[in-house]
Amino acid sequence: ICFKNNPKSYTYSADKVVWLTNPQWLVPELCKVYRGGRLQTDVTEIWQFEAGQNNYWRIKYRSGYEGEYTDGQINVVKTCLDEETSMNTYAYLKQVAAINPLRKEEDKEGILSQIYEKVDFIDDKTAAACYINPDKHKVRILSHKDLIYPFGCNASQKKAVAAAFEHQVSVVQGPPGTGKTQTILNVIANIVRNGETVLVVSNNNSAITNVQEKLEKYGLAFIVAPLGSKENKELFISQQTLVPTEVSLWSCPMQDGMRMKSTLHDTLRSLDKVYALLNEDAMLRQEQQSVDLEWRHFCMDNGIDEHTPLERRVQSSLIIRLWLHYQSKADGTLIAPDGLWSRITEGLKSLWMRIICRYRLRLHNKFEQSDMKPLVIELQTLYYLNRRIEIEERLETIRQELSTYDADLLTKTLTDTSMTLFKASLHGRYDKRESILFKDTKD
């Protein structure tokens, strides 16, 4: 290999060199180039070189300068509005927006139509592309790792945070006081920890203020820029905060960071077990109430003592199969098998059920082909008696398993470890960085 302004040639092994050929030219008007997170507005040419799973880029600027970059150095995004289907769908959406009455006056377009008119670029990797051209742009299931929960969580909040990083669009719904703000804070923490930015929007200022105040409470106000109205922007400009000096204390040596990540993973595994047990406990208690209520009504309807002792322990799942089978025979709703093999199979099934009823459940005197009702009542009785005991025993087992965990301590460990890792990421991002002060709202 020879280099410019150097007559000497050099040799390299094949694994040390990437030979890039046959570049693809991209239309600059249909792409956006970001460097260091900032949009490059003076791009005149974009060339893409592919080498295996990697992309290399040559970008030419209006000044004449040409730069070579890898995917990690720049981000080139393409619009989907150059596709016919996308253009037609988006044109339809703009027409629908034009007739929307939101803030629409006789001599003024509606606000929704104004917003649509301002959009001339839709990244083909965004969720919007999946909606306006679903045949080409498929919904993506994303992967995530090492999620942190510095603001605490419960089972549903943990699931919601994970879903936010697995799907392009997530909806978290719940009444006031169910922890939606806490979930949002954990999502924000994970986004910022990954070195990215996040825009938090709402139809009212109080929701945004709530998030901001929670971040201030943990000494994280310096990462927030409250914007929105002109007054809010001007207030932000006049009250800009520098990076606090305590950020220098948030460093975390690599060895300590690895240890904390290991602790975080172990804690999450234990909490997952606790959450699963608590969820099962809640579902079983709900089922217990339903089964007890059904049992009382069943006893009243059939003249059975509610305190009837259980003589034979049998799995309730087996009993309910027998119950439903003979109930359909008693009601005359059992579907007759069609075909020889089906009749043989159904015959063997009926024989197996008769054997179970006669010899395992010992229901000899209840087994009358001409009248199945007594057998059905006996099976129902056995089901309720067995299922009630099964639920009680499982609840006791869950109680004993939960007693081996300290859920409060696990939650505190999760929160503290996550916050330490989050602040360590902020230290790496802001400690040596000069504070940026904006002069006006146009910066």
Predicted feature locations:
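Glycine-rich phosphate-binding P-loop
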Residues: Q157, V172-T181
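Conserved P-loop NTPase motor core of helicases/translocases
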Residues: I111-K145, T209-K442
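Pre-Walker A (Motif I) flank of P-loop NTPase domains
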Residues: E166-V172, E196
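Short, contiguous acidic/charged loop-to-helix segments that flank catalytic cores in large enzymes
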Residues: V17, I148-Y149, T178, V201
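Extended hydrophobic/aromatic-rich secondary-structure runs
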Residues: I1-T70, R312-P374
